[in-house]
């Protein structure tokens, strides 16, 4: 688990400092491969005991391996794609280093969201992944690219603010049972005692969480950022948005869906999620 987080963040710092764009592209691929292999090892090594910040279970291990695999394959395509953008003059060598460094920070944010056992830390990780992709969508610095990046940033900020409010409401629902402190933010502890939480407050919290993280998933009506972000950003980032970032937000929703399912008096979020998915 430590390697899945340390490799991307340490690689990002190194990528930002390296001078040669060819070397940065190769290091990005090597770092992505190492992260993927570390994720695969989670299937065979003994899983760590759930702590206040880190959790590995049957749900997130699939997401982690999928995330690192797509991240690795996309980094291979990125190497040639971004080099071509340098040759055509659309990007400078400085922006190439910036791209590869942001790529690894993005991978760190998404991996952190998947392994987090703290709903507050998970929110921070999703926000980090969002901000890095915003910067990468606008990397061409054209009017259309900057407009797409700003639209993505504004709608994403609205969504993440709603998700933050929903997270706070979950903590408020848990506080009478869990007491003060971080126990009210630890997902495994929340699920164990969710049956005793205020169901009405949990229901309201899920509405905000659904709207907030649903914006990241691309659910209607807050999906307007998707077409422009795909069209104006680099092609590898379009693949990352579809194959990875949307999954991170969906994973967060699934965690809260499980939490509500542990409270028999709360709403059943499944039909709502299916309906909005079909509408979108």
Feature names for model-found ranges:
Residues 12-17, 40, 108-112, 135-136, ...:
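Alpha-helical transmembrane segments of multipass membrane proteins
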Residues 23-35, 90-104, 147-159, 230-242:
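Cytoplasmic-side transmembrane-helix entry/capping segments in multi-pass membrane proteins
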Residues 8, 118-136, 152, 183-185, ...:
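Functional transmembrane alpha-helices
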Residues 32-47, 106-108, 160, 245-249:
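A generic, lipid-embedded transmembrane alpha helix
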Residues 45-53, 86-92, 162-223, 228, ...:
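Juxtamembrane/interfacial segments at transmembrane-helix boundaries in multi-pass membrane proteins
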Residues 98-105, 111-204, 215, 235:
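Alpha-helical multi-pass transmembrane bundles of energy-transducing inner-membrane proteins
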Residues 2-101, 181, 188:
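Transmembrane helix-loop-helix hairpins at membrane boundaries of multipass inner-membrane proteins
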Residues 11-24, 73-89, 134-148, 217-231, ...:
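C-terminal ends of transmembrane helices
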